[in-house]
Design a protein with these regions (language model features):
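A short beta-strand element within the Helicase C-terminal
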Residues: 68-71
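Walker B catalytic acidic pair
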Residues: 7-8
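Inter-lobe coupling linker of SF2 helicases/translocases
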Residues: 1-3, 31-64, 75-164
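Conserved ATPase-coupling elements of RecA-like P-loop NTPase cores
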Residues: 11-34, 65-66
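Short, low-complexity, polar/charged sequence segments that are solvent-exposed and flexible
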Residues: 23-25, 73-77
Length: 164
């Protein structure tokens, strides 16, 4: 086998991140076994094909956090990340972003709490140029897919006795 085609590649986004960052929203500290298995296969194919043995297909490479972009790059551009000194997540994160702590309303709604998240981004053109080496990005305007007209209907109901 010298090439791996992976459809629905977003299913493998839960790869472990070696990081010193703790309690930062969007940075998972758990790993799915299937993601570890996929990473090992990608590493092997990169070695025997010179980085040309893997094709990922997905319409949602990034859905919840920037860590998902790093994970996709790690699968498909690991050698490049290593050569650039960005192989570890903390190096990648400090090059392309910053953790920002802000005060937010607590989920219970009874007070406030400090919440840290990977929220400020830097070097976006460089990051996008790297990502475009492995991604064929198409916008809805480029695809020109038919979009059905929406039919909106408002239905007003009286509350039940329990809801009052």
């Amino acid at each position: 086998m010298d090439h791996l085609y992976v459809d629905e590649a977003h299913s493998y986004k839960n790869a472990f991140l070696y990081t010193k960052m703790r309690n930062v929203a969007g940075i998972a500290q758990n790993e799915a076994q299937k993601s570890a298995d996929m990473f090992n296969k990608c590493q092997y194919l990169d070695e025997i094909t010179g980085g040309k043995g893997i094709t990922f297909a997905t319409d949602t490479p990034i859905s919840n956090s920037m860590t998902e972009l790093y994970v996709m790059q790690r699968y498909l551009q690991n050698s490049k990340l290593q050569n650039m000194g960005l192989g570890l997540f903390d190096s990648w994160a400090s090059t392309f972003g910053e953790v920002v702590t802000s005060i937010e309303l607590a989920p219970e709604g009874t007070g406030y709490r400090a919440k840290s998240r990977f929220a400020r981004f830097y070097n976006i053109p460089e990051l996008m140029n790297m990502f475009k080496e492995i991604a064929d990005i198409k916008t809805s305007d480029q695809l020109k897919l038919p979009v059905p007209e929406a039919e909106y209907e408002t239905v007003v109901l009286k509350p039940t006795e329990q809801q009052k």
